[in-house]
Amino acid sequence: MSNNDFLVLKNVTKAFGKAVVIDNLDLSIKRGTMVTLLGPSGCGKTTVLRLVAGLESPTSGQIFIDGEDVTKSSIQNRDICIVFQSYALFPHMSIGDNVGYGLKMQGVSKEERAKRVKEALELVDLAGFEDRYVDQISGGQQQRVALARALVLKPKVLLFDEPLSNLDANLRRSMREKIRELQQRLGITSLYVTHDQTEAFAVSDEVIVMHKGKIMQKAPAKELYLRPNSLFLANFMGESSIFQGTLQQDQVTVNGYQFKLNNAAQFGLTDGACLVGIRPEAISFKETGEAAQRCSIKSAVYMGNHWEIVANWGGQDLLVNTNPEQFNPELKEAYVHLAEHGVFLLKPE
């Protein structure tokens, strides 16, 4: 545990009966950063959040906040706040009373509460909403009230449990921008849970991908996407086409087509058989090329800002996303050209 590790889970296991849902997990979050737990349903991400909050107790292992062992501490003694998916607002209270409820429970004076509630509502762009009620504001505004209620307490750690799931696409975008802006401005150490990759990438300093109670990879979003460390990660983090290939120094061969991959060393593989992952945006079609680059177009769907294409290359499907101006939907055959930035290598599995 380094001096800058603010939230730490050490060898944490959680079992419900014989079912192990968190398996000897080690996790550390630096002070003032936002880390997202991302994974499919049932991977254990929400259980980790509940363990950090004190809503569940680990079967074994320890949890530290700011150097203090809080494994056996109640949620009230952890200096943590949670922003829930359901907002969890009191409909019979005004917005001001909802935001100030935690302060009231802490015995903060009425005058100080009013001041801090005003400041919190200004932070989430709801200045002057103190006297309104829950049924008088929109879903997006309700989520901002829930965020203000957490921020007003100035917690050591802020937890987000899929907070944007109930919002439509446009509101999700604006709310994730607001959450990220406030987290960076206030420097609150934060743990965020979602199953939405776009959301995770937008709000996080680092993303932790979980599967079956284990951490598969922890890295900034760009590294996760461009350098996944397993076939599971490659398939989970966006679309890709996976081919059997070979590596010889910086030369990669797929379907008989050999090309140079200048960044091959970063994948840590030895020469020989490998898996070659190709992101759909890394592929372009040309009218000329080697015989090994030739492919046939199976389908093409216009998606507005790009064409979504499935090509047959060497008897295997190749997924391609290309600019509308750079693709002719009448095309039947073409030659595959690869951009290095969207190619990654994996050990054979």
From Swiss-Prot:
It is a peripheral membrane protein. Its EC number is 7.2.2.7. One of its GO terms (molecular function) is ATP binding. CDD domains: ABC_Carb_Solutes_like. It holds the Pfam family ABC_tran. ATP binds at G39, P40, S41, G42, C43, G44, K45, T46. Keywords: ATP-binding, Cell inner membrane, Cell membrane, Ion transport, Iron, Iron transport, Membrane, Nucleotide-binding, Translocase, Transport. GO terms for cellular component: ATP-binding cassette (ABC) transporter complex. Part of the ABC transporter complex FbpABC involved in Fe(3+) ions import. Responsible for energy coupling to the transport system. Belongs to the ABC transporter superfamily. Fe(3+) ion importer (TC 3.A.1.10) family. This is Fe(3+) ions import ATP-binding protein FbpC. It comes from Pasteurella multocida (strain Pm70).
